[in-house]
Amino acid sequence: MNDIMNQSYRLASGYSMPVLGLGTWQLVGSVCERIVKAAINLGYRHFDTAELYGNEREVGRAIRGVERRELFITSKVSSEHLRANDVISACMGSLRRLQTDYLDLYLIHWPNDEIPLEETMDGMQYLIDEGRVRSIGVSNFDVGRMRDAISAAESPICNNQVE
């Protein structure tokens, strides 16, 4: 397992993402914290959470004590927060809960056809420009929506996470 723990992909943003990560969906409370700590002890450095999961505080407590540069943290903005200002506010909330200054990867959790992707991407770009997010991506986008996201974004879309 150590070999795969040391492998990473180079994202279009130029940053590297570990190939193996721990998803924290459905992990809550002290169970979440214990599992993330155990994963750290096993060598995991990539952790995936989301504002919708309700466990960012627990993930933040679990990663405390690990040098930030050793970690790769992914979080996701929920589909009701895709207006530019809402994207920024949601990210700042995630950062506070995770007790970190930046996210390595920030994803749009689910598409929302009520909000133009251009507006969402304006918020994402602001977060990149301010150093709060290193790479951006999407989750649960079909091919057409992925093309739209690529067209709407100033920075590269580095990931499409499909659940």
PLM regions: where:
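N-terminal binding-site loop/beta-alpha segment at the start of enzyme catalytic domains
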Residues: M1-L71, D101
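Active-site mouth loops of central-metabolism enzymes
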Residues: P18-S30, S75-N85, E114
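Conserved, mostly hydrophobic/aromatic
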Residues: L22, A39, F47, V59, ...
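Active-site beta-loop-alpha junctions enriched in small/polar residues
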Residues: W25-L27, A50-L52, K76-E80, I108-P111, ...
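Short, acidic/polar
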Residues: L27-I40, R83-Q99, E119, G144-R147
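Short, well-ordered amphipathic alpha-helices
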Residues: V59-R64, C91-L95, M124-Q125, M146, ...
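CE4/NodB-like, metal-dependent polysaccharide N-deacetylase domain
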Residues: V87-I108, Y126-E130, A152
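Beta/alpha (TIM)-barrel catalytic core signal, keyed to glycine-rich beta->alpha loops juxtaposed to Asp/Glu
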Residues: P111-E163
